[in-house]
């Protein structure tokens, strides 16, 4: 298994699909990486040479992925909560942020129903 950005990439899959195992790289970005490194999208990881895997590593290193991306996302959410803006308040209360209704629905965000105390 090739190791890119601290993640073991599956050997049996095509390059584009295998790169999506890295958090922060989807299909579009994986295709862009393959185009930039001149590696065929349909080539399997086990068929690539070490030099090609090194070029993939260098190209992936240009993007914000894995732990750094997770940290940035959590810092952005924390910043919103510290500002006290509407989105920050919604995060703090674990409610939907983007205008969805909450009288009914929103169960995923709100969690399981709580019994009414008498």
Swiss-Prot record:
NCBIfam families: uS13_bact (TIGR03631). PANTHER family: 30S RIBOSOMAL PROTEIN S13/40S RIBOSOMAL PROTEIN S18 (PTHR10871), SMALL RIBOSOMAL SUBUNIT PROTEIN US13M (PTHR10871:SF1). The gene is rpsM. The lineage of its organism: Bacteria, Pseudomonadati, Pseudomonadota, Gammaproteobacteria, Alteromonadales. GO terms for cellular component: cytosol; small ribosomal subunit. Residues 94-118 are annotated as: Disordered. This is Small ribosomal subunit protein uS13. Gene3D superfamilies: 1.10.8.50, 30s ribosomal protein s13, domain 2. One of its GO terms (biological process) is translation. SUPFAM superfamilies: S13-like H2TH domain (SSF46946). PROSITE patterns: RIBOSOMAL_S13_1 (PS00646), RIBOSOMAL_S13_2 (PS50159). Part of the 30S ribosomal subunit. Forms a loose heterodimer with protein S19. Forms two bridges to the 50S subunit in the 70S ribosome. Keywords: Ribonucleoprotein, Ribosomal protein, RNA-binding, rRNA-binding, tRNA-binding.
């Amino acid at each position: 298994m090739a190791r890119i950005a601290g993640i073991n990439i599956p050997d049996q899959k095509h390059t584009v699909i295998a790169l999506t195992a890295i958090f922060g790289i989807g299909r579009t970005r994986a295709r862009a990486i393959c185009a930039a490194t001149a590696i065929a999208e349909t080539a399997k990881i086990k068929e690539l040479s070490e030099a090609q895997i090194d070029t993939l590593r260098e190209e992936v290193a240009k993007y914000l992925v894995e732990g750094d991306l997770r940290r940035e996302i959590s810092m952005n959410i924390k910043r919103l909560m510290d500002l006290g803006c509407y989105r920050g308040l919604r995060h703090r209360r674990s409610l939907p942020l983007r205008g969805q209704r909450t009288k009914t629905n929103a169960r995923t965000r709100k969690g399981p129903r709580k019994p009414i105390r008498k």
